[in-house]
Amino acid sequence: MGFGDLKTPAGLQVLNDYLADKSYIEGYVPSQADVAVFEAISGPPPADLCHALRWYNHIKSYEKEKASLPGVKKSLGKYGPVSVADTTGSGAADAKDDDDIDLFGSDDEEESEDAKRLREERLAQYESKKAKKPAVVAKSSILLDVKPWDDETDMTKLEECVRSIQADGLVWGSSKLVPVGYGIKKLQIQCVVEDDKVGTDMLEEQITAFEDYVQSMDVAAFNKI
């Protein structure tokens, strides 16, 4: 497993392809897996790698909280496509298999205090989730206006970047280009979000992060479903 050398364009391309249908390196929330890969990259990916750039900017916003993100940080070779080997020079040794936390770990293996605490916390969370009854999910339909810099902006690429933003509770809908004057067109795009998972602030932060294409974003319409 791995991404190749994340300090090279080839490695970043592998990362971009890997994130084309994923919001995070593992699972549905930021974790130590994202931190490990983020720290292996020397800087923001180029704008044409929109999936990798979207992920990079999102994880960067967790800079102050990265130590508290869930999971156990492992070596880069533990993440990414199975068919690619990690060759990023990090100087860090691979994490030992004994460090992996097994939710149903064997009783006859010695556990560190941290590992034992983490396993107990996960078991408690699992039991808590199982006990909860399904709640009604509040959703909203949002119409966004995404404005380019000028009439030379590649609107196809702009829309591709916007749609590359993925999150649990976010579904993109139809879109169209609307003239605003002087040959400039804005992207008007519909999306449906789960209110407790996705907000307009998060959408604006991630969309405007594609600063090579996007000048600004506005909410044109907002309706509860």
Swiss-Prot record:
This is Elongation factor 1-beta. EF-1 is composed of 4 subunits: alpha, beta (alpha subunit of the eEF1B subcomplex), delta (beta subunit of the eEF1B subcomplex), and gamma (gamma subunit of the eEF1B subcomplex). Interacts with elongation factor EEF1A1. One of its GO terms (biological process) is response to ethanol. Keywords: Acetylation, Elongation factor, Isopeptide bond, Phosphoprotein, Protein biosynthesis, Ubl conjugation. Catalytic subunit of the guanine nucleotide exchange factor (GEF) (eEF1B subcomplex) of the eukaryotic elongation factor 1 complex (eEF1). Stimulates the exchange of GDP for GTP on elongation factor 1A (eEF1A), probably by displacing GDP from the nucleotide binding pocket in eEF1A. It comes from Rattus norvegicus (Rat). Belongs to the EF-1-beta/EF-1-delta family. It comes from the Eukaryota. The lineage of its organism: Eukaryota, Metazoa, Chordata, Craniata, Vertebrata. SUPFAM superfamilies: eEF-1beta-like, GST C-terminal domain-like.
